[in-house]
């Protein structure tokens, strides 16, 4: 027969009271590779677990393996079929051709229209790969953890009743488990685990506990060998089942023939007006459900629900007891309340939709649990729908049941009610007859069945009741202790943090006071030190402030006091060094630790004070420098002095301060190294743990792969062996479902690969389970002790840290685990079980008794195995939970300590970094200040140089503009003067000789060419000077810039070295030298730009003075000549020769001079010039004595005029240098500085400095150039005639008159430049008249030389000869001093000059175009050929030579 789908059963394990888990419990734990869910107190129907709903989580076995194991499963398919359900590594089912029992009905074979129905199954592995045994109800709504699921079921349909045959016999249907079989509960926890059972089931047999989630093996399912008899054959079992089926059918037929009474009247009496059911008679078979009136208490409701779920067999047991015992016995032994004993057992009634069952009595004593009733009876509800009754018991298959629908079901339930209430609805007159029929032989079997169930139920409830309070008390005590410990630790930690903060503030204040007292003492001691014997202290020692430990004049008592109060004492230093070298060792006492801490804090405070002092000094220095710069506008001299270096180095000079700074940085370095070592150690530990876990995981994977290969090989070997695999398994390794199959296969006598695989899988699963059990037990024992030791150590460490080494370690004691309960209770309860009465000797009674005993033994064995499994699971779960709780707490404590240590280390690290950062910031600020000062100095110097350069450029531009204006103005004046002279000469034009006209024309042409060449040379000279000045300035500026860059680089290097030396106290002297050099550099810089300006000003002043004098002389000469030419006070000869000799030579000389003379002319205003001309004109016109000053003007003008080029040729034809003597005379004159300032033109080596341009030596270059175009136009005949005529005229005049001046000039030309010209004896006072003039510089000497003979024949002429009136300049020598000075002109002189001028004017019209004078606007040929052509002229031709030289100039 098959299981009935609508039969229900309750779980025999009660769930724990629901309680919300703590956050610490929800935390996921990992220990030994086991993962457990924290939601172990929440319960859901097992169907959700089986279906893999959202609340279902994998079991511990699934978490351990992470893959399905190759083990046996009894849930191969929805129905019985061939095939072995073996799991491979992919999770798929491997079918094999062997028969296997299936206790789960297919979901498709159930009815779709029925409400929630629960089926019974024996499951080791769920269909959906859930490895924990559980019930699988039909899909439907789930109820809460404390709400019974039977209310909706009872309210939707009438309760099913068993047949009368089965009720009389008390036997279950064949092929179905009995009512005492204890399946798993319908509500499973969220993690897939069942609630742990008892721990004292070990006395029922040699069953070993195993892990939750691991499948049952053959050893678990089989009967122990020592208590097991030889299993009957398959034929005997089939015969027994067939006979029982026939007896059941016969009993049902007999029951159906009995008279029946309609139950309608009885049902109407059982219901109240309010629609609520009310039972007036005790009905043990009626289930006790949770009422909706709310009279249950929370704890009592929990316990009743747990007890109800523990005893799923109470329904059938109570019903069997009511049928076995009489009404009087039932009322007296079970209820003992206000039930009427005369009415007997009331008939059961069907409940309609929406109805609910009421308690047994009105006062609810049975529901609350009467103490007089046995345990598990009064407080539990029973369900008449026992698991022993299935659909097959009534001859209805599931398929037919689904097809017939509601009518067939209604008829079926009516037959059940009729058979069930047969003996209860008969009238009172037939009571004795019904009583005789009820008391039959099968009732004795029901009594045994009921007593056995009661014993087990009572024992289970008692053990549960004894265990739950103790476990709850222990758990509660542990949680309270853990909570109190954590609260105490947190409170202590907060107190310590607050105390530490306050203590730190107090220490800081105390250290500051000590330091202030120490500073005051040092200030008081310092005057004594300075006033003591010995040499006076140096200036550097006085500026260092506090110098602890360096005083040599302090008395011993005061020195000892300073050493004791100084933070750098030797004892503290030794202690600190020892602590730094051994960081894990503690100090001798707490007082020493406090002293060390104070010393470190004082050192940090000293460092802070020193930095503040340095910052203050730096700000003062910067403020002083800023004020000095703003006040003076230049750099202060003390900016780079040694005072700044001393101020920086002085605070670090004391030895104790340096020592403490070194110790502080050493301590910080040790601290950082210690933190790095700690982090490395933690990383190594974590790496080792991960490596070990990885190795274990790899080993497990390798074992699984090897297991698969071995299973395959063994299966192939067993396939060849055939039936030997079945015989080797033995009877002790076979389960309930496998016994008949194995025997059937033995009888068939054939083997297959599926048989071998099945047997091998069973054996391998058993070995694997044993190995894992041993590993689990060993790991539990080992890690339990390890965790206890770790917990004790961590708690002891916490106490030592929080309360000190003298504190007690009471909190480290952990509550001991409860000892496992002994099995004496179970044995006593089993001993009290009443013996089964003797059975009748009839065949039917024997067979029924034998089958019942067999079924009872099997169920008992399975129950014992399941109880032992629950016991081991409960113990392991409790130990695991306890271990994980304390392990998590210890880990949390360790993590908190590590984080706190890390936070303190990081705080100290930040403090040290802040100190170093502040020091670096100050150093950077100082460097920035120095750099700013240096950059400002460079910027000011650059600005000054740029300003000077711009001013110089402006001056040069103004100078060029002034030169241009002067040149243009001078040219205009010259043109006006010569145009006026030309006009005067045109009015007085007369017939003159041709040579004189040509001579006059040559003079003017030469003057124009000289003016042109002088302008070109002046422009070239000015450009060259400007280029020289620019190049010189550029070179000087580049040199200065390079020097500044080199000095800046050296300065930066010196600053960096000085900064390092200041910190290390090693470079004080080098810093002082560097700052002295920096101080001297700014002092020398301002004087450098002034030097070129001063030199330029000196040159300009000298040029102005010299130019002014020269311009004044030149202006005087021109003004006098204009006056004489206009007034006619001098002779015509004198007026005609004066521009030729004096004015023209002076103009040429002034034109040749440089830009100095032209620049000076710009300073002469037109008003001053006009006033000067008017003054000279008035003096000459009135004949005042002051007019004689014009002689000095002539003298100055003629003294400055160098000899003409014709005078450079001697009478003998030899050329002698004459520029040296003339230069000597210029140096002796007052205008010599003007000529000395004239620069030397580059490339002219023969040019003597200080001489005009025409005094240079022509050299051989004079003969290399070709003849000018003007000379080529003249014919050779004209040249010879001109020379001959000129020579004759001059010789005749010289012989006739004997001009003393001409002879003197000739003698001067003959003697040379180095010889002095002797004073020629001149008759008639001629020598006396010329005595006022230097040799060769008599006025008109240049023009008089034109008439000299080049052959020197007149050298020895008589100077006493008279002066002819027709000679041009002879009357000048013969005249008196007044006439020589220009104040009076003789008539003879005027007549002679007039005659000569007339001849010249009369001769000019008769000449052709070739001999006509060249107009002024068209000067002669230009270029360097002019000066070279003069050199090629013949040297011995007198007037012709002079004419040629003047023409070329």
Swiss-Prot record:
Residues 1-32, 123-201, 258-298, 315-437, 523-551, 1257-1278, 1399-1449 are annotated as: Disordered. The gene is C1orf167. It comes from the Eukaryota. InterPro entries: DUF4684. Coiled coil: none annotated. This is Uncharacterized protein C1orf167. PANTHER family: CHROMOSOME 1 OPEN READING FRAME 167, SFI1 SPINDLE BODY DOMAIN-CONTAINING PROTEIN. Residues 1-13, 400-419, 1258-1270 have a biased composition (Basic and acidic residues). It comes from Homo sapiens (Human).
